[in-house]
C-alpha cells in the first residue's frame, strides 16, 4: 500500500513518478488491474521509501529542523529516476519551487 500521494508531501522527483502512475491508471483502467502499471507503482513505492529514509537520516533529534525537503539528493534516487534523467525527462537540481518544507 502506498502512502498519501498528495503533491505537497513529496519531492519533485517523486511527484513526477506519482504523476506517471496516475496517468497510467487513467489511460489503462483495466490494465492497472492486471499489472500494466506495476513499473510505475514500484517506482513510486521505492521513491517514497527513499524519501522517508532521507528524512530519517537528516532529522536532528534535539535541534530545530533546518533542512528543507524539496529535492531528493541523487544518492537517494531510485533506478527509475536515474533512467528518467538519462532520457532527459527529469532535470535534477534546477527547480526548487516544489516539494514540502519539513
Swiss-Prot record:
Coiled coil: none annotated. Pfam families: Cmc1. InterPro entries: Cyt_c_biogenesis_Cmc1-like. Transmembrane segments: none annotated. It is found in: Mitochondrion. It comes from the Eukaryota. A motif (Cx9C motif 2) lies at residues 37-47. The keyword Disulfide bond applies. GO terms for cellular component: mitochondrion. Disulfide bonds join 14-47, 24-37. Residues 11-55 form the CHCH domain. Keywords: Disulfide bond, Mitochondrion. Its main location: mitochondrion. The keyword Repeat does not apply. A motif (Cx9C motif 1) lies at residues 14-24. Belongs to the CMC family. May be involved in cytochrome c oxidase biogenesis. This is COX assembly mitochondrial protein 2 homolog. It comes from Caenorhabditis elegans.
Amino acid at each position: 500500500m502506498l502512502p498519501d500521494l498528495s503533491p505537497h508531501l513529496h519531492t519533485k522527483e517523486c511527484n513526477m513518478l506519482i504523476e506517471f502512475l496516475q496517468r497510467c491508471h487513467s489511460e489503462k483502467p483495466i490494465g492497472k488491474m492486471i499489472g500494466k502499471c506495476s513499473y510505475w507503482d514500484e517506482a513510486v513505492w521505492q521513491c517514497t521509501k527513499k524519501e522517508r529514509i532521507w528524512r530519517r537520516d537528516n532529522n536532528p533529534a534535539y535541534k530545530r529542523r533546518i533542512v528543507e525537503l524539496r529535492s531528493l539528493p541523487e544518492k537517494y534516487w531510485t533506478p527509475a529516476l536515474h533512467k528518467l534523467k538519462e532520457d532527459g525527462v527529469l532535470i535534477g537540481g534546477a527547480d526548487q519551487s516544489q516539494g514540502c518544507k519539513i
